[in-house]
């Protein structure tokens, strides 16, 4: 509810909105940057029930908030509540970053795709996306951001498989002819010849079932990445690495997607480095 929000302060406020939100690493992440750059700002967790979302969002700009991150289950809902929605957020169908303008208007953006690509480029600097097809496992909200960013980066073909095929078909309908849909039972086959492979599901996360996709078709030249970062080295990445592939864990996507929002809210472009990784994992 609105009356649980922090009292306005002279220092700018930002936070993460979700339900639940106690698990979020965003306060630790942004807190590290605020301390590192000596910024007199605050970043807080905001547990907001879905039925209170609109009320809270409209109140926040008047309480000293300059913006917010958005997590489950509000990433789709905020699009209808924002005054301005970026093209990429509209295409993906979700927003993870809100900017509260001085005139009270709410701008919604999605930086997940940016974070995904920036993570790969930081940890696999020789990656060339247009060398061959990309294969994406999963078709949920995170997958949509990955698909958009890979196509924008120039992959010549994007293969996708999802347990519910209709969701993959929806992505093909919205993102165009470069998207090729595979049946879930054929997910292993779509890895043949792929130069980039992404697990965009929650499978393999601690407490979740493992990702059961055959990896025999992986070539050692393939870059393999996983959006899951608990654990950092998922069984999927471990097997790919054992097959000679270069692998990139999912933590960096979380870190990089946060940077554009932090810069807009606090006026400092933050650095994503090993110190930040250690702070977020502590």
Curated annotation (Swiss-Prot):
It catalyses: shikimate + NADP(+) = 3-dehydroshikimate + NADPH + H(+). The gene is aroE. Gene3D superfamilies: Leucine Dehydrogenase, chain A, domain 1 (3.40.50.10860), NAD(P)-binding Rossmann-like Domain (3.40.50.720). NADP(+) binds at residues 87, 138-142, 162-167, 227, 250. GO terms for biological process: amino acid biosynthetic process; aromatic amino acid family biosynthetic process; chorismate biosynthetic process; shikimate metabolic process. PANTHER family: BIFUNCTIONAL 3-DEHYDROQUINATE DEHYDRATASE_SHIKIMATE DEHYDROGENASE, CHLOROPLASTIC (PTHR21089:SF1), SHIKIMATE DEHYDROGENASE (PTHR21089). It holds the Pfam family Shikimate_DH. It comes from the Bacteria. Keywords: Amino-acid biosynthesis, Aromatic amino acid biosynthesis, NADP, Oxidoreductase. This is Shikimate dehydrogenase (NADP(+)). Homodimer. CDD domains: NAD_bind_Shikimate_DH. Belongs to the shikimate dehydrogenase family. The active site is at residue 75. The keyword Oxidoreductase applies. Its EC number is 1.1.1.25. Pathway: Metabolic intermediate biosynthesis; chorismate biosynthesis; chorismate from D-erythrose 4-phosphate and phosphoenolpyruvate: step 4/7. GO terms for molecular function: NADP binding; shikimate 3-dehydrogenase (NADP+) activity. Shikimate binds at residues 24-26, 71, 96, 112, 229. The lineage of its organism: Bacteria, Pseudomonadati, Pseudomonadota, Alphaproteobacteria, Rhodobacterales.
């Amino acid at each position: 509810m609105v009356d649980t929000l922090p009292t306005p302060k002279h220092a700018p406020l930002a936070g993460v909105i979700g339900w639940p939100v106690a698990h979020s690493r965003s306060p630790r992440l942004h807190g590290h940057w605020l301390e590192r750059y000596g910024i007199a700002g605050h970043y807080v967790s905001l547990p907001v029930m879905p039925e209170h979302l609109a009320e809270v969002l409209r109140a926040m700009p008047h309480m000293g908030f300059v913006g917010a991150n958005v997590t489950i289950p509000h990433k789709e809902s905020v699009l209808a509540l924002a005054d301005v929605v970026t093209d990429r957020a509209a295409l993906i169908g979700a927003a993870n970053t809100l900017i509260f303008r001085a005139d009270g208007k709410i701008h919604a953006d999605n930086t997940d795709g940016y974070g995904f690509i920036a993570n790969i480029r930081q940890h696999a600097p020789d990656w060339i996306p247009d060398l061959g097809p990309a294969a994406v496992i999963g078709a949920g909200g995170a997958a949509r951001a990955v698909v958009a960013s890979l196509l924008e980066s120039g992959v010549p073909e994007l293969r996708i498989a999802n347990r519910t095929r209709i969701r993959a078909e929806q992505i093909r309908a919205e993102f165009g002819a470069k998207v090729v849909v595979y049946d879930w039972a054929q997910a292993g086959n779509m890895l043949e010849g792929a130069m980039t492979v992404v697990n965009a599901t929650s499978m393999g996360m601690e407490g979740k079932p493992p990702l059961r996709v055959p990896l025999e078709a992986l070539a050692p030249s393939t870059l393999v990445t996983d959006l899951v970062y608990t654990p950092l080295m998922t069984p999927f990445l471990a097997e790919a690495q054992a097959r000679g592939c270069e692998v990139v864990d999912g933590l960096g996507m979380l870190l990089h997607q946060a940077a554009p929002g932090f810069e807009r809210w606090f006026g400092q472009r933050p650095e994503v480095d090993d110190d930040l990784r250690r702070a977020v994992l502590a």
